[in-house]
From Swiss-Prot:
Belongs to the histone H1/H5 family. This is Histone H1.5. The keyword Phosphoprotein applies. Keywords: Acetylation, Chromosome, Citrullination, DNA-binding, Hydroxylation, Methylation, Nucleus, Phosphoprotein. GO terms for cellular component: heterochromatin; nucleolus; nucleoplasm; nucleosome. GO terms for biological process: establishment of protein localization to chromatin; muscle organ development; negative regulation of transcription by RNA polymerase II; nucleosome assembly; protein stabilization. The modification N-acetylserine is found at S2. The gene is H1-5.
Length: 223
């Protein structure tokens, strides 16, 4: 009995480990299948854009181009047809000949130009974002400019004081300019001279009075 008991307990251990290994292998296989390359629609659009035929690319010519790129055409034949139909329905490809997947296909220039414009807009937005990141550096320069602005008022105060001294000195010049007023008053003196000159005219009759007195004395003596 003692020999059979350990055999029963040891048997379940490998049964529990085996399912975990199977799950990991399945996940790894699924990851490998997903990472096989770009989708069929991208390969078809590249092949059609590379062709220089004006009438468009036929289905057999498209398969040859895909096979040259290393794509397995025989296994993915149904995917190629579905990809062509979806691209025609979206408007990226235009079917010039035939119906369905059979026929010739060409790139839609309007759709291609519409896809190119959003890319240009994205690049413009990226360029606009770069200056936005560069702008915070400018405020640092302005901070330096503020320091220079603070220093300048000290220099400005000195010329202001010098200007005040000059203004204080200017009244002396004004006093010197005021002196000619005294010189202007001097012409009033000739008026006084004129008055003196007029006085002798008044004094002349006074000088005549003594003569009259002398005449009176002479008359009295004669009497």
């Amino acid at each position: 009995m003692s020999e059979t008991a350990p055999a029963e307990t040891a048997a379940p251990a490998p049964v529990e480990k085996s399912p975990a290994k199977k799950k990991t292998t399945k996940k790894a296989g699924a990851a490998k299948r997903k990472a096989t390359g770009p989708p069929v629609s991208e390969l078809i659009t590249k092949a059609v854009s590379a062709s220089k035929e004006r009438g468009g690319v036929s289905l057999p010519a498209l398969k040859k181009a895909l096979a040259a790129g290393g794509y397995d055409v025989e296994k993915n034949n149904s995917r190629i047809k579905l990809g062509l139909k979806s691209l025609v329905s979206k408007g990226t490809l235009v079917q010039t000949k035939g119906t369905g997947a059979s026929g010739s296909f060409k790139l839609n220039k309007k759709a291609a130009s519409g896809e190119a414009k959003p890319k240009a807009k994205k690049t413009g937005a990226a360029k606009a974002k770069k200056p936005a990141g560069a702008t915070p550096k400018k405020p640092k320069k302005t901070a330096g400019a503020k320091k220079t602005v603070k220093k300048t008022p000290k220099k400005a105060k000195k010329p202001a004081a010098a200007g005040v001294k000059k203004v204080a000195k200017s009244p002396k010049k004004a006093k010197a300019a005021a002196k000619p007023k005294k010189a202007a008053k001097s012409p009033a003196k000739p008026k006084a001279v004129k008055s003196k000159a007029s006085k002798p005219k008044v004094t002349k009759p006074k000088t005549a009075k003594p003569k009259a007195a002398k005449a009176k004395k002479a008359v009295s003596k004669k009497k």
